Swiss-Prot record:
UniProt record similarity statement: Belongs to the HisA/HisF family.
GO biological process: L-histidine biosynthetic process; L-tryptophan biosynthetic process
Record's keyword annotation contains Amino-acid biosynthesis: yes
Cellular compartments annotated: Cytoplasm
Active-site residues annotated for this sequence: D11, D132
First-tier enzyme category under EC: isomerase
EC id: 5.3.1.16
UniProt GO molecular function: 1-(5-phosphoribosyl)-5-[(5-phosphoribosylamino)methylideneamino]imidazole-4-carboxamide isomerase activity
Name this polypeptide is given: 1-(5-phosphoribosyl)-5-[(5-phosphoribosylamino)methylideneamino] imidazole-4-carboxamide isomerase
Organism: Nitrobacter winogradskyi (strain ATCC 25391 / DSM 10237 / CIP 104748 / NCIMB 11846 / Nb-255)
Pathway: Amino-acid biosynthesis; L-histidine biosynthesis; L-histidine from 5-phospho-alpha-D-ribose 1-diphosphate: step 4/9
Cellular component, GO annotation: cytoplasm
């Protein structure tokens, strides 16, 4: 069994922590004006690893919320995986040099697979690929466009590239609290050797329990956003279950 990590999500829009519904920037809810305060709260709750996305950057194709990200890096000791607007090796190098533990390459993984290979070779274990699927097909450009390739097609391209993880998001569920699409995520994880992290729709403690079932043994973790912000998921209870599963493994 993979060591399961529950990643609390910080999505940045105009320097603030927001949650979107199905990736729609027009359907954003602000949950905290200060990302540093939010990251500190997650650290105090016992989380081990932050998942941060520069939403504006994902649409712009380059970092936009760099100041907010850097403030979190300076003020909060937790490792961070960061996505959004990372489309070239220079940006990968810059973020890893500033203390980001792992970068997530999304759109560029579809458009420029050579970048993923180069980045993973230059920074072993510090490059992840974000695959966000709508009706099975991978969406790009901040989910504004849908490609003609499936998540599995792209994941298989990187089997031998040495990437740290694939973050698989079901766009149809994202931000709607309908529960993780574990069937699709497990099917992907069972078809490749790369660790897979589930995202999109995390709703309650039931998702944590499902994540720890034997059938999900190849999953490396999950990302939770709105369920934590809305109080539907008790972080203490969730982390207790995960730590108990680790101890028993």
């Amino acid at each position: 069994m993979e060591t399961v990590i529950l990643f609390p999500a910080i999505d940045l829009k105009s320097g603030q922590c927001v949650r979107l519904e199905q990736g729609d920037m027009a359907r954003a809810t602000v949950f905290n004006l200060d990302p540093v305060e939010q990251a500190r709260a997650f650290a105090a709750q016992g989380f081990e690893y932050l998942h941060v996305v520069d939403l504006d950057g994902a649409f712009a194709g380059k970092p936009v919320n760099a100041d907010a990200v850097e403030r979190v890096l300076r003020n909060v000791a937790l490792p961070m995986q960061l996505g959004g607007g990372i489309r070239d090796l220079k940006t990968v190098e810059a973020w890893l040099g500033k203390g980001v533990a792992r970068v997530i390459i999304g759109t560029a993984a579809v458009r420029d697979p050579v970048l993923v290979r180069e980045a993973a070779k230059a920074f072993p274990g510090r490059v992840a690929v974000g695959l966000d699927a709508r009706d099975g097909k991978v969406a790009v450009e901040g989910w504004a466009e849908t490609s003609e390739v499936t998540a599995l097609d792209i994941a298989r391209r990187f089997e031998d590239a040495g990437i740290a993880a694939i973050i698989f998001t079901d766009i149809a569920r994202d931000g709607l609290l309908k529960g993780l699409n574990l069937d699709a995520t497990i099917a992907l994880a069972d078809s490749i050797s790369i660790p897979v992290i589930a995202s999109g729709g995390f709703a309650s403690i039931a998702d944590v329990k499902a994540l720890l079932e034997p059938r999900a043994k190849k999953l490396a973790g999950a990302i939770s956003g709105r369920a934590l912000y809305d109080g539907r998921l008790d972080p203490v209870e969730a982390l207790k279950l995960i730590h108990a599963a680790r101890a028993a493994a």
